[in-house]
Amino acid sequence: LFLPGLMGAAILQVNILISRLLAYSLDESAVSVLYLASRLMELPLGVFTIAVATVFFPLLAKALSNHDETAFSSAFLQGFRLVVGISVPAGIGLFVLGEPIIELLFLWGAFEKADVLATVPLVAIYGIGLPLYSAATFATRGLHASKDMRTPVRVAGYCLLINLFLGLLLMQFWGAAGLAAANVLAALAQSWLLWRALSARRPGISCHALRPALSKVLLAGAIMGLFCALAWSFLAGFGLNEKLSSALVVSVCVPGGATVYFILLYLLRFEELATLKAMFLSHFAKR
């Protein structure tokens, strides 16, 4: 059971690896920018989404061992709301602030402004895909808790083929950005297929139950993104050099955007706000 479970959970890494191999047929810079963009996306995925999945997995398994479908559905939906509440603003942040983040982290030595501009579209694409990767990760844990190892593996196989086909096709038109887009479209297919399989197995899990939370998160995330874009535009007018300007933008927009987001979730009465806030505070308290 370990190897099938590993394959089902690791399809994201496999698809990104395939995209990197395909990128070698473009040019060396395509490999580099694809690697950097995917690593930026994997940071919030690994720090927050996988942490939520790890915490909720034993709760899901315990509920099923007690034959308590209601407890399973309740725990899964709570965890999924947390995953959405984390991944959506993180993805919007990458989409809006990709350029200053890349400049701050990587604009050193041989990595020049042209490389930054080549990486920005890929970071934006992966930012769009982050909620999909997160949804697929958590849905996989839900199926594993149900002792269903075959479905994630079967879905992973389908998505590997989707990613390969779309990668070969889209790279002809958009280069490295096409490879990133293929990853995201494969993640869309994976998250939809896994959710469909889990909801068929567990009737208590439905999209209808998540609509209120998803609407609140999308609204708060959109306003947060607008705040970040306006703040970046304002701070860019200070006339600082690229490095100082990007450091100022990131240091203001990231905590400022998070504050705006949490205030909006509070006003919208998002169900898991207290848990979400505790996760952020505990993570940054360790830093």
Language-model features: where?
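Membrane-embedded alpha-helical bundles of multi-pass transporters/translocases
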Residues: 1-287
